[in-house]
Amino acid sequence: MDLLNALVALTNFVIVPGLAYGSQLALGALGVTLIYGILRFSNFAHGDTMAFGAMVTILFTWLFQSVGLSAGPLPTALLALPFGILGTIALALVTDRTVYRFYRQQKAKPVIFVMVSLGVMFMMNGIVRFIIGPGDQRFTDGERFVISARTFKKLTGLQEGLAIKTTEALTVITAVIVVAVLFWFLNKTRTGKSMRAYSDNEDLALLSGINPERVVMYTWMIVAALATIAGVLYGLDKSFKPFTYFQLLLPIFASAIVGGLGNPIGAIAGGFIIAFSEVTITYAWKKVLNYSLPDSLAPDGLVQLLSTDYKFAVSFAILIVVLLFKPTGLFKGKAV
Amino acid sequence: MTETMKHTLLFVFVGVMILLEGMTDFLFFSGSWNSALVILNMGLISAIMAIGVNIQWGFAGLFNVGIMGFTALGGLAVVLVSTPVIPAAWSSGGVSIVMALVMGALTVVAAVMITKFMPAGKLRALVLAVVLIAGFFVYRAIFDPAVGSVEAINPALQGNIGGLGLPVLLAWPAGGLLAAGAAWLIGKTALGLRSDYLAIATLGIAEIIIAVLKNEDWLSRGVKNVVGLPRPLPYEVDLQSDPSFVERAASWGIDPVTASTVYVKAGYALMFTVVLLALLWMAQMALKSPWGRMMRAIRDNETAAEAMGKDVTRRHLQIFVLGSAICGIAGAMMTTLDSQMTPGTYNPLRFTFLIWVMVIVGGSGNNFGAVLGGMLIWFFWIKVEPMGILLMELVTSGMAEGSALKAHLLESASHMRLFTMGLILLLVLRFSPRGLIPEK
């Protein structure tokens, strides 16, 4: 019975939050990695693109809520999501046309692109703060839990409760669907294949008649959609605050690099590696150990390896270790 | 008009702007000498940071987005050097904390040695894991109780290990050293890889430094802040009660309160100018020397430089450390100016990316450009807010009183800053990528 309790506590505090956070990171890292693979630079504006997408979705959510539209037990934000995606796609395409295309034609060095993306980051950050303000916004509605701790305890008679938030379940399900569609697109459709060809060898792709501007356009559309979905899921699960999205940049980059920049499968794996490391290292293991160890061995302290304030340090440490020993990432990315 | 003439005029323009700030309250100027000197002082510090970044980016093409972290380390140096010694803290746990840190460092060194000298294989992985895990637990076992006892000492005012009680001016070079040490560690791992990786690694180290400063209360009181740091100049209140100062102020026809505040700020401005000029001179000499030419050769074509027998990675590490040290000095100066250490106020947009805008706008590769960019962009950073409010008042003047949109626009005007800075950066990168004062 005690072992079962330990298992439930572990699921409740580590596995479920880790899965949800990992899915959010994976979606974010997929966007970064696609930009890297096709446009060949690290997009520092990605966190703020996520914030922008989430913001547009929030505005539509509020509109729907005010006219009484709702998705029943699911959050209204799901209905607003397509509009958020459209808005972000528009922004991404306008940015590409006005900003990035010039440097592409000039064949500028990657580091110039990175710098330009800094400027874009500033402007997007400014726009988001200008429209919705720098504060915290909550926009989650609908049913709060798929299963709450109390019902779980009643059902099983265990001491430990297991709570699964609707947003957590939703995050994982959405991520699975999005990733499946993305891989189908990249592997089976003509456009997806041309994107992969362009990413593998630009010159060869150009020779075989692939239009680079079209490839770039599709990439931005996909990245905008991914960023919006990741941003909205993160906002639903935690809360929306522009600065938090900027800070997400570090774990997202860490995920993409750990998996191998430019490699979509690596981005997903990296997202979960980073998420689970953060959660397990900053989790206080006392409860789980108390259940699973005999009384004589039960720990006195919290058995927390690092305080939660250092979760950035965890993703960073993993990043450094990977850079030192396997600079191309676990799944063979493009970058050296 | 010659180049030199044009560049001098640009500097004159910044000077006139700051003078106008002091003299007139027309449009967005405030007409207060205090505010003009505040802008000037932070402008000088920004110029020093811009020189540091320019050395890294303009000389060597290194992309460092962790400036905030090095600045904060400079601030930490002020606390550690200048605050009074707390003997109780040292007798109760300070020594153990130092021992624990040494222990942690030794563990890492041992791990590095093991990877270097043992043959690769399962045995090495096992030994490595055992050393790291054992080291971590020993470290925590010494560290945790020591921290507890240090933080228990007079927690309302101290609760940290205190400083060395040395003159605060010594903290400036100390800040540089601290930042240089951090830069060496990060450069050792990330240099020699792709340029983007250095960017991401520095971004990460900056966040971690801030996280440490916020949470390690034994070090610099964390978010409880250290206030009332020693100052190199007298306090305004003391000046106001000094009869000879009051008399002199009266003979100039200024009231003692204004006179004392302006006196202190002008004193800082003088000190900062001296540091700025010294660093500018050194940077200029370095740029002109064979060493500077080698750096630019490496920047322009790494492969060719390597073929000529230059050790690119080592040179990169060297310049990365130097540039970061300058940022550390500037950070220490800033904390001295504020005479308080507030880790909560460090924000990457303000302390990292703004400095980048300064360097790019001023002209990367040119030290004078960096100084100009630092002063100019700082002036606009301060003044964009009143400008934005003026603009919004103009835009909304036709709207009905009390409409929600008008209220929102007026309220959000202060967020124009980031947007404007991004716009300036993009415009300069696009239309004048060499900046206001281009590299020669």
Where are the model-predicted features located?
Chain A
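Transmembrane helix-bundle core of multi-pass membrane transporters
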Residues: F102-Y103, V111-K188, V215, Y283-F312, ...
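Hydrophobic alpha-helical transmembrane segments of polytopic membrane proteins
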Residues: T88-A90, L250-I274, S315-F325, L330
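Inter-helical junctions in multi-pass inner-membrane proteins, predominant
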Residues: N5-Q24, F185-R190, V216-G262, V279-L289, ...
